């Protein structure tokens, strides 16, 4: 079942190694679950079959044999139908995303959770997103987290026609190793800064005008909130100094967040 959902991720070099290792781990776990049940079910069937043979109910035995279905087969059929529907949807979306004058957004994700006995739970997550805009503009985001291996990584790519700048970050929470790599497609490393500026300028052409007014209003509201917090601080600093200072800090943090530009790359540290 997992292989059906993850086939598209396995074709991507960013995900392939982790997905292959995780799929093998899932197969071993499912095999350990199914084999004991399979032996028990076979032994029960044998005992029942011998009893029915002694009683002479051969027809009933044959009908039971024909209707005996693995408990996983029904789920497999359901997942196969779901996969076929998703593939058809992706094909239709692929035709739309090829329109050079259109906007499009696509997103795919998969997650597995397993827990055996007293062992800590194992969580595997992967997601990919693609945004497109006219003029050959594209942004890609990929992320993966594997609690079993401790690996967390993500990649953000900015594309203009056949040029691209991709930043990849990874961290292993078990070993503490961290790595940052940059990939330059059809350009040199020295051109990265100019390319990033060009990409940002192209994106600004498609920003809704109201977004800038909303941003200005947000700044004004935060400044007014900060001023009122300052007055409140003066009135209460003798009796409630710590809460007032914390209130002012929250206002300053909110104002600082408004100055963020572009598409930042973050790694969640635990």
Swiss-Prot record:
One Gene Ontology cellular component annotation held by this UniProt entry: cytoplasm
Interaction with COPS3: annotated segments: 50-125
InterPro entries for the chain: Myeloid_leukemia_factor (IPR019376)
Phosphoserine found at: 6, 8, 32, 34
Assembly mode: Interacts with CENPU. Also interacts with NRBP1/MADM, YWHAZ/14-3-3-zeta and HNRPUL2/MANP. NRBP1 recruits a serine kinase which phosphorylates both itself and MLF1. Phosphorylated MLF1 then binds to YWHAZ and is retained in the cytoplasm. Retained in the nucleus by binding to HNRPUL2. Binds to COPS3/CSN3 which is required for suppression of COP1 and activation of p53.
Main location: cytoplasm
Keyword Nucleus carried by entry: yes
Listed name of the protein: Myeloid leukemia factor 1
Keywords, comma-separated and alphabetical: Cell cycle, Cell projection, Cytoplasm, Cytoskeleton, Developmental protein, Differentiation, DNA-binding, Nucleus, Phosphoprotein
GO annotation terms (biological process): DNA-templated transcription; myeloid progenitor cell differentiation; regulation of cell cycle G1/S phase transition; regulation of DNA-templated transcription
Location of the region described as Disordered in the Swiss-Prot/TrEMBL record: 127-148, 221-247
């Amino acid at each position: 079942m997992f292989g059906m959902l993850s086939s598209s991720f396995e074709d991507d070099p960013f995900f392939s190694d982790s997905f292959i290792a995780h799929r093998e781990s899932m197969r071993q776990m499912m095999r350990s679950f199914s084999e004991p049940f399979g032996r028990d079910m076979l032994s029960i069937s044998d005992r029942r079959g011998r009893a029915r043979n002694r009683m002479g109910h051969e027809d009933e035995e044959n009908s039971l044999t024909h209707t005996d279905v693995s408990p996983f087969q029904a789920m497999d059929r359901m997942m196969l139908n779901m996969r076929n529907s998703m593939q058809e949807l992706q094909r239709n979306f692929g035709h739309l995303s090829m329109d050079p004058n259109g906007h499009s957004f696509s997103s795919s994700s998969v997650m597995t959770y397993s827990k055996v006995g007293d062992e800590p739970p194992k969580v595997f997550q992967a997601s990919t997103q693609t945004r497109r805009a006219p003029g050959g503009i594209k942004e890609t985001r990929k992320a993966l987290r594997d609690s079993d291996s401790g690996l967390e990584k993500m990649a953000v790519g900015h594309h203009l026609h056949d040029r691209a700048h991709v930043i990849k970050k990874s961290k292993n929470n078990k070993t503490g190793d961290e790595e940052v790599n940059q990939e330059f497609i059809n350009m040199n490393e020295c051109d990265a800064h100019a390319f990033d500026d060009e990409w940002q300028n192209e994106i600004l052409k498609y920003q809704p005008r109201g977004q800038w007014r909303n941003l200005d209003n947000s700044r004004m509201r935060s400044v007014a909130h900060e001023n009122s917090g300052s007055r409140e601080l003066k009135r209460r600093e003798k009796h409630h100094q710590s809460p007032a200072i914390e209130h002012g800090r929250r206002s300053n943090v909110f104002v600082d967040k408004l100055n963020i530009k572009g598409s930042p790359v973050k790694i969640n540290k635990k």
